[in-house]
Amino acid sequence: MAKTLMAVDAGTGSVRAVLFSLEGEQLGCVQQEWTHKEDPRYPGSMDFDWVHNWDLARSCIRGVIEQTGVNPREIAAVSTTCMREGIVLYDQQGQEIWACANVDARSDDEVAQLVHMNPELEKEIYRESGQTYALGALPRLFWVKNKMPQVYEKTAMCTMFNDWLIYKMTGVFSSEPSNACTTGIFNLEKRDWDDRIAASIGLKTGIFPKISECGTVVAHVDAKG
């Protein structure tokens, strides 16, 4: 019988797993700090170590189950949240190939390029998504294209960190509007990605996951996850 709910949060400075009763009472929480390493080649960069950090996330999930003594079979649902604006890129096989935290600031030159290419684009992005260039995915994807073309060419999918958690637990790529819009490549009114924005500056289209509204069951946790 389903008795509890789990939330997993990939925050800026830490990851945590929290268990709640069906009435919303917090039953337990386990948290692990993580650090984002600067690539010495690129000032302002903050790389995300997906291998180590997934180990930390898993340890939090196991830890809160042990802390509370809850039977995993009695967890009715798992939801994910995360730091805004951080992104993960994947290749055609679904393997992570590049990721940066939300505090990454390496794409200053790309912001200047975007302004030069189209002085009105940032205003248009803000009208549609509520996002500006600051911390958004658009300049970062442009940076990867300019500075790491071999990674860019392999990129087949781009997700936010709450989407990454879902993918690691289920093998399914999915996203939701409240965080997808922080990419700046999203139309909040239509509740979907705006490929037109990406195409207007020569970026790939079709590399973002299917959108589902918050609260939608998008997949089931598998044994691998």
For the regions a protein language model found, what residue spans apply to each?
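N-terminal glycine/serine-rich phosphate-binding loop of ATP-dependent small-molecule kinases
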Residues: M1-A99, K154
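Glycine-rich phosphate-binding/catalytic subdomain of phosphoryl-transfer
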Residues: S59-G225
